[in-house]
From Swiss-Prot:
It comes from Drosophila melanogaster. Residues 93-124 are annotated as: Disordered. Involved in sex determination and dosage compensation. Required for proper expression of Sxl in embryonic somatic cells. Also has an essential function in the yolk nuclei. Involved in endoderm migration and midgut formation. Homodimer. Interacts with dpn (via bHLH motif). Interacts with da (via bHLH motif). Interacts with Bap60. Keywords: Developmental protein, Differentiation, Nucleus, Sexual differentiation, Transcription, Transcription regulation. This is Protein sisterless A. GO terms for cellular component: nucleus. GO terms for biological process: anterior midgut development; cell differentiation; endoderm development; positive regulation of transcription by RNA polymerase II; posterior midgut development; primary sex determination; sex determination; sex determination, establishment of X:A ratio. It is found in: Nucleus. One of its GO terms (molecular function) is DNA-binding transcription factor activity. The keyword Iron does not apply. Residues 108-121 have a biased composition (Basic and acidic residues).
Length: 189
């Protein structure tokens, strides 16, 4: 048998991360049952849907781990706003003591202000966390997209190299075109 001299770069699931690695052996009950019985279209569809669900869940876990790690590495800092000027506090004290209602209303106003300030601080902190999480998720998805694009380009190069070698060995070009049409590669060039 003639040996092929295709240059195959490291095409493995390890380069893409273990997220995309298919099940090996009989670790998946769905695979072992599907392979032991005859392959019916319903079983294949169920197996594909289970595999897609597994991949989606694993991808979501990877994304969440990445976001959590980035939040740990880049803690969110919320600066405290400057306290209000003393003139405002003095004017409020003068109005509050001039009304003659006692010190109860002044402390109620200060408590309400303190609670509002604390609520605003929490809200600003939560908003900053949400923005950071979105930024890190976007960074993760962009990185995954770049990896996928690199893998796709590599596969295109391997296919083009294989086609060139087949043509050099005398394989009919019409058959290659038919194969391209069958596998949906006619739009790639």
């Amino acid at each position: 048998m003639e040996r092929s001299h295709l240059y195959l770069p490291t095409l493995s699931y390890a380069a893409m991360g273990h997220v995309y690695a298919p099940y090996r052996g009989s670790s998946s009950p769905a695979l072992s049952t599907a392979s032991s019985t005859s392959s019916k279209p319903e079983q294949i569809e169920e197996l594909v849907s289970q595999q897609l669900h597994h991949l989606k869940m694993h991808y979501a876990d990877e994304e969440q781990r990445y976001v959590d790690q980035m939040l740990l590495e880049n803690p969110i800092v919320v600066e405290r706003r400057a306290p209000p000027p003393l003139k405002t506090e003095l004017a409020m004290d003068c109005r509050g003591s001039g009304s003659g209602s006692g010190s109860g209303s002044g402390s109620d106003v200060k408590d309400a202000q303190r609670q509002r300030a604390e609520s605003c601080r929490k809200s600003r902190y939560n908003n900053k966390i949400k923005k950071a999480k979105l930024r890190f998720r976007h960074k993760f998805v962009s990185g995954q997209l770049k990896k996928s694009a690199v893998m796709l380009d590599t596969m295109r190069d391997v296919i083009a190299q294989a086609e060139r070698q087949l043509l050099e060995r005398g394989y009919p070009a019409a058959t290659l075109e038919r194969m391209r049409a069958t596998f949906g590669l006619e739009m790639e060039q």
